[in-house]
């Protein structure tokens, strides 16, 4: 797979190369590679890899152009490109565009998976929109298809702490403890300790 003169490249190979070229040589080289491959190899995988690169670089205009192209070519029928754009808008603070994307997903019957929900929740937390955050939490808790792990309650606790809602944060931390693995998770434990420290309730910090 090292030389296209001797090995036939698959769409997955092209996507892998695009990701690698972007990481090693930069976005411009990745774009040149994409522009020079045959149309046959410009599949969902290739467009998805290029979109991921634009999101990584926070290049909104180019990401939106590729997203539009994917829609025109019927390559935006899954949650993947939408999740990428939600991630991008969350990073750039364009929360109104996230709402539009989620409405579009609902209108087109595209499943809003766990990644979609968590990205939307993160955007609400960044905007200190507590009602929005709670709305997403309720959807996740009520949908039997979602697995609510400790990280979800950790995110919600951080949202409450951000706006000074200590009692609600403490309630989420209790739920977080209930979702932590029995054998313990170093990462989860570190988050839990940090959150309890931020509540100012030292007795909870010492308890855990």
Where do the PLM segments sit?
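Inter-helix linker motif
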Residues: 5-6, 39-41, 58, 74, ...
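Helix-turn-helix repeat elements of alpha-solenoid scaffolds
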Residues: 19-27, 56-62, 91-97, 122, ...
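Alpha-helical repeat scaffolds
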Residues: 30-37, 63-67, 98-102, 133-140, ...
